[in-house]
Amino acid sequence: MNRANDTSSNLKLISLVVLIVQTTALVLTLRYSQTQKSEGPRYLSSTAVVCAEIIKLITCFFVIYRNNGYRFSGMLNELNREIFASPQTRADSLKVAVPAIMYVIQNNLLFFALKKLDAATYQVTYQLKILTTAIFSVTMLGKSLHRYNWMALILLTAGVALVQYPSGDSTTSKSTAAEHDASDNILGLGAVLAACFSSGFAGVYFEKILKTSKVSLWIRNIQLAFFSVFGALLVCWLYDWQAISDDGFLRGYNGVIWIVVLLQAYGGLVIALVVKYADNILKGFAVSLSIILSSFTSWLVLGDLTITTTFAIGATVVIFATFLYGHEPKSTPAEAHNA
């Protein structure tokens, strides 16, 4: 039993560290791709999402193929047994469509919010997803959070908001905000809040599926990627169809962009590992720390970021919140007696 607990703890730690490294590498590669001078049109992020989901599918198929002794028939038998064999397995597979659909809704809400809000309001408000994730973890998974945990989550939300706050000229921010009237702001805030709840619900729902089912992580990722591909293609059609028609699906792609796509694809698999062996709340802390690490590295190496006082305060708050969340409060004599 202790060996199983040790293995689970090791997998939790390893998956969190890998997530921090992967997210940091992804952000830095994205920043580097923005500094590249390229002839012709830039690549479309919507098509990159489609490519990433397809790569996830191929990778998961290969892992199952390998686990079955590199036998194609063995892979097909496992897929049939876990996904198609009975009405129960088919219904179970459809459960994964819920987070996939929620992610599509979330992305569309964020597209809408970006058109209605200035960057500062959008970035700060969207950090509420940290709190909605915690709320759904308590209500859907029965997770118990101490007051120290809630304090840490509130501080984390505030710290990430400060880190992500745009560092541009204040007069520019004011003029940009002035372009949006009151009704735009209300609609934009409503869209961001809805996206926060969508993000929290989808993440925790997928966590519940992973932790309450005997279906392998790779099968679950195949199911999620399958539904996500259709969602990503829908976004391409809604927002970038004209550009794709004019310049092609892979317009603007080069070596760096393909690295971004690969990091995005395998990042999705790492997130699934984190959700299975840790949880969505710890995932939020890992991603927050990677934002700070990538920003600092970008300032140090690429020189495309200015470290402001706001960023420094936010980074300090995030680090403090991380330690506070890991704080184990001493039990009172009464609690110790009851235990």
UniProtKB/Swiss-Prot annotation:
Signal peptide: none annotated. The keyword Transmembrane helix applies. The chain crosses the membrane at residues 44-64, 94-114, 148-168, 186-206, 224-244, 255-275, 281-301, 305-325. Keywords: Golgi apparatus, Membrane, Sugar transport, Transmembrane, Transmembrane helix, Transport. The keyword Transmembrane helix applies. GO terms for biological process: transmembrane transport; UDP-N-acetylgalactosamine transmembrane transport; UDP-N-acetylglucosamine transmembrane transport. GO terms for cellular component: Golgi membrane. Widely expressed, including in pharynx and pharyngeal gland cells, seam cells, spermatheca, stomatointestinal muscle, vulva, and body wall muscle. SUPFAM superfamilies: Multidrug resistance efflux transporter EmrE. Pfam families: Nuc_sug_transp. Changing residue 192 to F: Significantly reduces transport of UDP-GalNAc and UDP-GlcNAc into vesicles. InterPro entries: Nuc_sug_transpt (IPR007271). It is found in: Golgi apparatus membrane. Disruption phenotype: RNAi-mediated knockdown causes no obvious morphological defects. In an srf-3 mutant background, causes accumulation of oocytes in the proximal gonad arms and abnormal gonad arms, such as twists and overturns. It is a multi-pass membrane protein. Its main location: Golgi. Uridine diphosphate-N-acetylglucosamine (UDP-GlcNAc) transporter in the Golgi apparatus. UDP-N-acetylgalactosamine (UDP-GalNAc) transporter in the Golgi apparatus. Apparently transports UDP-GlcNAc and UDP-GalNAc simultaneously, and independently, by an unknown mechanism. Functions redundantly with nucleotide sugar transporter srf-3. May be involved in gonadal development. Belongs to the nucleotide-sugar transporter family. SLC35A subfamily. This is UDP-N-acetylglucosamine/UDP-N-acetylgalactosamine transporter nstp-4. The lineage of its organism: Eukaryota, Metazoa, Ecdysozoa, Nematoda, Chromadorea.
